[in-house]
Amino acid sequence: MAETQVRNFNINFGPQHPAAHGVLRLVLELDGEVVERVDPHIGLLHRGTEKLMEAKTYLQAVPYLDRLDYVAPMNQEHAYALAVERLLDIEVPKRGQLIRVLYSEIGRILNHLLNVTTQAMDVGALTPPLWGFEEREKLMVFYERACGARMHAAYFRPGGVHQDLPDQLIEDIGKWIDPFFTTLKNLDDLITPNRIFKQRNVDIGVVKLEDAWAWGFSGVMVRGSGAAWDLRKSQPYECYSEMEFDIPVGKNGDCYDRYLIRMEEMRQSVRIMRQCVDLLLGKERVGPVSNTDHKIVPPKRGEMKRSMEALIHHFKLYTEGYHVPAGEVYAAVEAPKGEFGVYLVSDGSNKPYRCKLRAPGFAHLQAMDFLCRGHMLADVSAILGSLDIVFGEVDR
């Protein structure tokens, strides 16, 4: 009997697939049920953010950053604000730094809650997302009370933050902390020892440390493979050097380790938040929240109604904006998904000459082929869930 050559089977995973996390299209080449090749097709959410920023003043460009990783918006603004501040060579007052750190950690918890629970949902557990969204809702309200918006905040501005936080809000954040530990324990008890969850994640998507560096991984993807690399510790910015927290590090570099790290990072974020709350209600209770140079930071409303100079400053800042000295700078923050960097080039005008955004998800997604090869088709969604991809930042 003549031998027939069996061809590999090509299928599309996404862009409408519920486990594709947005608009990802993967072309999978399958040998039976074993994945031979993965070809990610991106760009379905490309909006030309970097080009649009070149036509806006430095302040007008801030809201574009919210729309990248829209799960934790303020962390992106943070990198941009740091870049502009370095070019302008200005300092952020202590209270402003504490508010930034507090809200960056809220963003980290928002992100990890979504990721951990949807990673469980990708492998068939439907309860965790409902619990996770309940907590995220409370955090969204803290966002809203700080700046009026639940998602697209535009709260971190070059020079500091837009408005001061009322004491009541800081106290409420402090009251939220202890009950959250109970929620985390419930999630932990439900997912971590679960036999099915373990079978779907242990020894799946293993990354050795040298491979993680070679593919340009950062954040949880590197820490899961055994490197204690966290920009908050290794290259501290704002007041992270004064905060006490630990960096969780994995051993095996698989999906399960990455899940465990995200769970522990939420506990560490809460530790940082508690320290910030204590300081903001203690010795940093009063003080400016942004730089007081009115050539860069707009004056207060009340001042504007009394002083002609303040009114002129306000008008100039919101029409022409401030001119940033020519130069280039790279600022990176430890965003929830990894190292989010902003490479900013200024030509001395009031608009960025070029703003390159370094999205962590982009580097992680390009390794999809390397991660999935040899795994089963069902493991693709487990691996994708552990990468923590949001398409706003991948496609930009």
Swiss-Prot record:
Membrane topology: Peripheral membrane protein
EC number: 7.1.1.-
Cystine residue pairs: none
Reaction equation(s) it catalyzes: a quinone + NADH + 5 H(+)(in) = a quinol + NAD(+) + 4 H(+)(out)
UniProt GO molecular function: NAD binding; NADH:ubiquinone reductase (non-electrogenic) activity; quinone binding
Tagged with keyword NAD: yes
Family under the similarity heading: Belongs to the complex I 49 kDa subunit family.
Function: NDH-1 shuttles electrons from NADH, via FMN and iron-sulfur (Fe-S) centers, to quinones in the respiratory chain. The immediate electron acceptor for the enzyme in this species is believed to be ubiquinone. Couples the redox reaction to proton translocation (for every two electrons transferred, four hydrogen ions are translocated across the cytoplasmic membrane), and thus conserves the redox energy in a proton gradient.
Complexes and interactors: NDH-1 is composed of 14 different subunits. Subunits NuoB, C, D, E, F, and G constitute the peripheral sector of the complex.
HAMAP family tied to this protein: NDH1_NuoD
Protein name, per record: NADH-quinone oxidoreductase subunit D
Organism whose genome encodes this protein: Brucella melitensis biotype 1 (strain ATCC 23456 / CCUG 17765 / NCTC 10094 / 16M)
